[in-house]
Every structure is written in structure tokens, then in C-alpha cells.
Amino acid sequence: MRSHILGKIELDQTRLAPDLAYLAAVPTVEEEYDEFSNGFWKHVPLWNASGDSEDRLYRDLKDAAAQPTAHVEHVPYLKEIVTTVFDGTHLQMARSRNLKNAIVIPHRDFVELDREVDRYFRTFMVLEDSPLAFHSNEDTVIHMRPGEIWFLDAATVHSAVNFSEISRQSLCVDFAFDGPFDEKEIFADATLYAPGSTPDLPERRPFTAEHRRRILSLGQVIERENFRDILFLLSKVHYKYDVHPSETYDWLIEISKQAGDEKMVVKAEQIRDFAVEARALSERFSLTSW
């Protein structure tokens, strides 16, 4: 796992509370890449390429600065964090995120953009604790704690889940560089850069051949009508068992083959490629159209 803690700030709960209340009240709309999730998944753009409050698409900024949206003036504490904790020179986007009773399927980000993936640098900070909310990055599952500033290696296979209805609002701030860089360059105050903290990594159970056999037995019940549901079910397995999240797609393809439905096999292969291999900017994928 390359994801790691960069530092930590003490969140002022009194100042944070009205910001979180405002973000919670922003209407939920269909998200970019909404097919990656089920349940409640919400992004509120604070800085983006256009300054448009409805623009949720991440895209490369070259020779241009990220623009604040109208939401920024309603979240003064988060505005202060973004502008004083971070150096805005290479800022691409800043947004709040929330996930409740939902999972984001394993995927890779930045595959639709122009820079080398190592030039993108995503930070993630949980703003409120949700004990059943987790991230995964390659072979590791993480429970992020409020105030921890994480580098989230979104260029590798990763996922997120919240097994509860307890809100888990967070702040995601993205940077991009044109050449080699030091990760501490993202901070306005170099003293905030304090890597090396011990993360909270939940223990997972061993994954055995018997577990795999049981998963593949879903080939007896999968249909086009529940294909999407089974994908999201499979995406949760690696949070409880010590298995790589990309196995989700290997299982889905094998289960589809057992069903004897060639269109289902093709769709399983296509969602794998769309999620972790390559896709065009703004390209969408349907899990329910056949």
C-alpha cells in the first residue's frame, strides 16, 4: 500500500458543525461515474475547473487555477483549511464527499487523464467518524480517523465502503504536477507535514479455497436482473477477508461464465476494463442495459 498519513490537524468541532450541516443540506444529484456506487454517494464541489457549483467532473488544469464555487462561502471553516493548510499552487479540485450505506466498487482514477498517473496527488481527510466506514488500497483496508491527512493512492486499485447510515463526510483535495515533486510541497505550512503515524488497519479473516468456492456458486443464481447487485456484493468481500479487491472482477467473470450467458460475460469483462484499465473523460457505463 502506498497510501499513507501525511500529517494531522485538530478539527475545531464548533466551527466544523455548521459547515457539515450546510453540506448535508445540499441536494443529492447523480454523480460523475455514479455507476461506481450504490446507496448514498455524494460530492459537493468546492474548487473545480469552472467555478460552477454543479460541475463535479475532475479534469486536468494546465496554466489555469482551480476556481472556488458558490459553496465555498457557505463553509468558511473548510475554506480556511483548504487555503491555509494546503498550498494552492498545484490545486486541481477540492470537494466534500459522503458515503452512507453504500460501496464504491474497486477502481482506478486518473486513467482518463493526460498526465502520468504519478503526477497526480490526492489527499483525503475524514471530517466525522463513522466506525463502519473504510477505504481499501490494493492489499490493505484502512479506517481513516478525523483530522488525519492521507495521501490516497487513487491511481492504484482502491475502493470505499460505509456499512452503516452514520454520516462520513470528508474533504478530498487533489493536486497535479508537471514533473517530479516532493509530497510536502502540497502544504502551505511545512510543519504540518509529519508522516509516519500508525494507521488504523482493521484485521481481516483469511480467504480460503472454500470461500472462493462459495463465491463462485453464485453462478447458480446470477441473472441479468441481479448482475449489478452481485457486483456490489462481491466488492464488499475484500473488506472482511484478506483478498485483493481486483479479485472482485475475476469472480464476476467466472460467475457469469457459469451462468452460460455470453452477454453477461462480456459485460463483466467490460466493467472490469472500465473501472481499472481505461476509459475516456466523461465516458459512462451501464450495468443494467443489455
Swiss-Prot record:
Its EC number is 1.14.11.28. 2-oxoglutarate binds at R168. Inhibited by metal ions such as Co(2+), Zn(2+), Ni(2+) or Cu(2+). Is also inhibited by EDTA in vitro. One of its GO terms (molecular function) is metal ion binding. Fe cation binds at H107, D109, H158. Optimum pH is 6.0. Is stable from pH 5.5 to 9.0. Binds 1 Fe(2+) ion. Transmembrane segments: none annotated. Its cofactor is Fe(2+). It comes from the Bacteria. Homodimer. Dioxygenase that catalyzes the 2-oxoglutarate-dependent selective hydroxylation of free L-proline to cis-3-hydroxy-L-proline (cis-3-Hyp). This is L-proline cis-3-hydroxylase 2. It comes from Streptomyces sp. The lineage of its organism: Bacteria, Bacillati, Actinomycetota, Actinomycetes, Kitasatosporales.
